[in-house]
Amino acid sequence: QAFKGFENLSNPWGLASNTRGDWFKELGVQTPEENPDFEYLFYVGCAGSFDDRYKKVTIAFTKLLQKAGVNFVCLGDDEMCCGETARRLGNEYLAQHMINFNLEMFDTIGVKKIITACPHCFNTLKNEYPQFGKGFEVIHHTEMIRELTRKGAFKGGKKFSGKGPLVYHDSCYLGRYNDLYETPRDIAR
């Protein structure tokens, strides 16, 4: 069932691919056609596009990028799954189809830097796409937030007081696979 969703709709949930970009329609996010001189592609991923809980992360991060004046675009309905799940489930043919499709699209629109909030997409884009002949600077959203915070992009915002619990989940794909442990902690300090 999941493979059929990937093959026909480019997502494991089997949701209509023409709704992939619905989350950003009211936010004024541009596509590469509208902003061909973008600096960053915000690659949202399947969960960030379709899962209602994860969309909250996508929307909040988008608003931070906009507040900081970052020149970015999203692919919206044209985004295809990065291929991570198909590859992990053993469907290498389907994964390579998705990877090659994305690489062609990235090349066509001139992608050089990719930001993503999804740890699975981050690991795949950063460590597996270069095996297919093309690599990019891939940045996890916590790295971008840390950098923008250091530059003072969010002055006037609320700061964590240090009182009470602050919970952060160290994703396997960020921590163990990419050694990104301190980045989110730096943001909270």
Feature annotation, model-predicted:
Residues 150-189:
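Redox cofactor-anchoring modules in respiratory/redox and cofactor-processing assemblies
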Residues 44, 140-142, 170:
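Short, structured patches in soluble enzyme cores that scaffold and shape functional sites
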Residues 1-117, 122-129, 133, 148:
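Iron-sulfur-cluster electron-transfer modules
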Residues 56, 97, 139, 143, ...:
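Conserved active-site and cofactor/substrate-binding residues in soluble primary-metabolism enzymes
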Residues 121-123, 144-147, 172-176:
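Short, catalytically relevant binding-site loops at active-site mouths
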Residues 132-162:
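Short, flexible loop segments at boundaries between secondary-structure elements
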